[in-house]
Amino acid sequence: MANTQITSRKAFRRTDDYTPGTPKVKLVNEALPNPIPPNSVLIKVHAVSLNYRDANIANGGNPWPVTPNGILCNDAAGEVIAIGERVKSFVIGDRVAPIVDTANITGRETGRSWLAADEDGVLADYIVFDEEKISKLSPHLDWIEASILPCAGVTAWSALKDIGIGKSVLIQGLCLPVHEYVRILY
């Protein structure tokens, strides 16, 4: 376990004020868990990717309920800077991204819990995640490239996971990240 001097973070939380012309987010300073929970890691966020969904949630247009005043965004890439005492899969310096649906880790679970909707998102300078809810990133991607992986990759996989062997898939618009992942996975 590494001890870190980071005890607080800056994060962008929704105001949940949907009046036209009012701010939709506010920058807040808030405490981080100290010590880090035993199975968790502290991540320094290097890049966050914005999706249409993020603007939709901030503007009150999400069709499902969201956590009040939650932190926005579900795609990020960062570096592990501290680990809890029971963490086995990660070390300080690992490049990681959070799993977007934290209740559906293997793809076989039936529950759902989406970052930035059902729980806080990643638009912060530091985030804490259980080690089972993050993935290692390839070293050949820069931080910005890596930050688009979580949602686009999961969306592509979700679209393909129930397609049977010998079935065809039509992929339109090969210029967007989700389309590229579908092409690669299929």
Q: Where on the chain are the PLM-derived regions?
A:
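Mid-domain Rossmann-like dinucleotide-binding core that forms the NAD(H)/NADP(H) cofactor-binding site
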Residues: I144-Y186
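Short, Lys/Arg- and Gly-enriched loop/turn segments at beta-strand edges
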Residues: A103-G111
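Structured surface patches comprising rigid loops and adjacent beta-strands/short helices at the edges
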Residues: V128-K136
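Eukaryotic N-terminal low-complexity, Ser/Thr- and Lys/Arg-rich leader segments
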Residues: M1-T22, N29
